[in-house]
Amino acid sequence: NLSNKKMPFLLYPYIEDEFQLSDTNRYKKEVFEVERITDVNYAKVDGFWLSIPDDTIDIANVVKNNWFNYLKKKELNLDMDIYLPKNDTLTQRPLMMFIHGGAFFVGDKATVPYQKWCNHFASLGYVCVSINYRMGFRPNQKAIERTAYQATQDAHAAMRYLVSKQDIYRIDTDNLFVGGASAGSITAMN
């Protein structure tokens, strides 16, 4: 019975060279205006759908209006919005990629919270990206699991695309960060 025993342990802090700042406000304060590039295609895939903005969701209507989409997958263009700090002189900047939530069923890269997050981080000096990914699933456990796996594949494809375009967007590939909400956070952890 371990419930009454004290278990000593030691934490070893992860030590990394300090993040080098070119000026004292970068990454701390909003110092840049932001350029937004919308609907950058990063892949083509087969799936049910990509985007149902979740700011006015009525799940019953989503199911009713999209049930024909469950019959057959179609080719979809995976897109992302890219937010860049304007007039930034650094040749390499850290990247933050956000993945929206919505239970792998609804959501969109351009909903207000993701626009605000991306604008904020780009104004600090990061390259920031919000992606769309395949959504929708037939009502069975295997299909739901497959949808989560496909979202992960799509996020990996987005990151591969960004790394391949690192010179264009001036991305520091040693500093790549991924986050999300709900289904997006599940995807980000994979």
Label for each model-derived stretch:
Residues 4, 8-91:
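N-terminal cap/lid segment of alpha/beta-hydrolase-fold proteins
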Residues 91-103:
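Short beta-strand element of the alpha/beta-hydrolase
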Residues 92-95, 124-128, 173-175:
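Loop/turn elements at helix/coil->beta-strand transitions in domains of secreted/extracellular proteins
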Residues 103, 135-137:
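Alpha/beta-hydrolase active-site loop signature
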Residues 103-106, 128, 161:
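Serine-hydrolase catalytic-loop signature spanning alpha/beta hydrolases and amidase-signature enzymes
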Residues 110-130:
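Short amphipathic alpha-helix adjacent to the substrate-entry channel of hydrolases
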Residues 145-167:
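Alpha/beta-hydrolase active-site loop
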Residues 160-190:
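Primarily recognizes the serine-hydrolase "nucleophile elbow" in alpha/beta-hydrolase
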